[in-house]
Curated annotation (Swiss-Prot):
It catalyses: 4 Fe(II)-[cytochrome c] + O2 + 8 H(+)(in) = 4 Fe(III)-[cytochrome c] + 2 H2O + 4 H(+)(out). It is a multi-pass membrane protein. This is Cytochrome c oxidase subunit 2. Binds a dinuclear copper A center per subunit. Mg(2+) binds at E212. One of its GO terms (cellular component) is mitochondrial inner membrane. The keyword Cell inner membrane does not apply. Cu cation A1 binds at H175, C210, C214, M221. It is found in: Mitochondrion inner membrane. GO terms for molecular function: copper ion binding; cytochrome-c oxidase activity. It holds the Pfam family COX2.
Length: 262
């Protein structure tokens, strides 16, 4: 199965979901689209009938001043449809804002025009947290198969099937941290911490971009996230000289991550 996890030229469909939040957004989209098609068909039919009757007889509606029944119908019918759309929207909005007990936290900082990531739960051998900056790869440095304006020199690495909290802020202007396949879009506002959670259910590479106009190089702020197995994530921690004997790392990897396999 080929997954659609990146934007495609002339693409009109949503990217494949990799989290429960993204799946809920897709279901809500289909739910609302049903009512939109229903309204489009009904309104188009009414307009067709009115135009056809008027063309055949311009005095067809000469003495029509009001219609109590139709007025009640076009008041109640839209109200019912709005309620049918609103309730699922409110439920999904609440679920997307809910942050469950996270196994790990990643701090995301937006700057003009790059991202900075901090793994505050993990410390290296000298007692410092893992942190790095992520820049877009210029066109003249792209390798074969790389994605223009989407690939970065470094990427976020997270384990699969793990509750992850992203704490998002900015240092200069407003940015927006967005990864469509994860159903994630949250503003990065200077002086404010916003948070969102994600439970990525399959491994892969996911791309996003800054979705808030933030200056001349707004289009040069891609996001690249790699979701790997728990074993590969622990190996990545070792490559960054994280001490696996520290209590915080044991809690976030051994206890919270390995138990997911069972």
């Amino acid at each position: 199965m080929i997954r659609l996890d990146v934007p495609t030229p002339w693409g009109i469909r949503l990217q494949d979901s990799a989290t429960p939040n993204a799946e809920g957004i897709h279901e809500l989209y289909d739910h609302i689209m049903f009512y939109l098609c229903l309204i489009l068909g009904l309104v188009s039919y009414i307009l067709y009938v009115i135009i056809k009757d008027y063309k055949d007889n311009r005095f067809a509606y000469k003495y029509v001043r009001h219609g109590q029944v139709i007025e009640i119908i076009w008041t109640i019918f839209p109200a019912v449809i709005l309620l049918l759309i609103a309730f699922p929207s409110f439920i999904l909005l609440y679920l997307c804002d809910e942050v469950l007990t996270p196994a790990m936290t990643i701090k995301v900082i937006g700057l003009q025009w790059y991202w900075k990531y901090e793994y505050s739960d993990f410390v290296d051998s000298i007692g410092e947290t893992i942190e790095f900056e992520s820049y877009v790869i210029p066109d003249d440095m792209l390798e074969p198969g790389a994605l223009r304006l989407l690939d970065t020199d470094t990427s976020i690495v997270v384990p699969v099937d793990t509750h992850i909290r992203f704490v998002v802020t900015a240092n200069d202007v407003i940015h927006s941290f967005t990864i469509p396949s994860l159903g994630m879009k949250i503003d990065a506002t200077p002086g404010r911490l916003n948070q969102v959670s994600a439970l990525i259910q399959r491994t892969g590479v996911y791309y996003g971009q800054c979705s808030e106009l933030c200056g001349v190089n707004h289009g040069m702020m891609p996001i690249k996230l790699e979701c790997v197995s728990i074993e590969d994530f622990i190996e990545w921690l070792g490559e960054n000289e994280v001490s696996l004997n520290s209590s915080m790392v044991e809690q976030c990897t051994v206890n919270a991550l390995i138990l997911v396999q069972f």
